[in-house]
């Protein structure tokens, strides 16, 4: 990684993308006395953590469940005085449509102890922000990795939720790195602290986007509805051209996946090669009213999470409000098939799909394949940090969970953008992480 030049004075930084990672890095930079402009193509902030209101209720379209591992998010919520509430209960709907509890055999059959020993031996830094530190050790396809280590009950206990959350099916060739990171972030593998008075999972009252709007409101320069047309990087700075005019800066932070920004970036051969290797999942959120379905819970559909052969069918749905039949449904697959397959799935469960309010498609979980991980793709991405005055945050270097992207973005800002001269102090972030201590 390149070190910043002339770090004594305030830097000017353009941040492209106003999702959680972009807003988190912008907040850190402003807190350290730097001048930041955030550019967002959409009309609102929050990225994949958007919320909408229907019938007087807030519905989250993407990320919103927080576990006891979400310490950075909890700190943000506390600092900004954002109200939280417990999440809905989790249930699995089996092939017959019966609601059952998720199997927790992994925590009781001795596999957890074997996993902890394996973790200590081969990937001890997996819980730290970022992925590069553990990528080579966990590059094998998840199914093969589970079989090689005799952790079949780990798949039984975490596979349904993993697939329902948009990360793929366990019979695909997705590397074990991502499955293990997900399992760690559930908070079930190791006891964690009670956060914000919640003994279990929690979320934001009134929609998760409330938090990101609050973050954006305290920043000095957030511009929504602005399309970046090109990024020009020079030895003396960066010029980000937009449909509203150019933005001059010392540095640019790309809070969107490299393959998404590539068409407007004056990319190097190395950047182009890495971008060409990025994969993502076509994941859909459908907000719709449906009657006759199990209520009051977050339901995982076992028949559609067990194998990639069921791709396109609904993998989960969330019924959050007792006085509303509106639910959020989640599925993979082709956009033109999602609604028709959802109608069939609801009917098969004994329900009826009523009004469809909206459908949102995400390029979810940007990641590298196993061969690329083994060959050091994430190390190569890390080596690009700061080069050509460019920094990368988001799901690709961090993993597509909001706590992971925020922690990685915060740590990047703290390590590489020291407080400007004359800045009294950063916000109180509490004790340094292990990763931060290694950098000092």
Regions from the language model: what does each represent?
Residues 185-237, 242:
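Helical element adjacent to the flavin cofactor pocket in flavoenzyme catalytic cores
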Residues 47-69, 121-133:
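Glycine-rich active-site loop/strand segments that organize a redox cofactor
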Residues 30-53:
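Glycine-rich FAD pyrophosphate-binding loop
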Residues 73-184:
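Mobile amphipathic helical/loop "lid" adjacent to a hydrophobic cofactor/ligand pocket
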Residues 229-341:
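Mid-domain catalytic core of redox enzymes
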Residues 11-38:
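N-terminal Rossmann-like FAD-binding beta1-loop-alpha1 element of flavoenzymes
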Residues 3, 317-440:
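Conserved flavin/dinucleotide-binding core of flavoenzymes
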Residues 1-13:
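Extreme N-terminal leader/targeting segments of oxidoreductases
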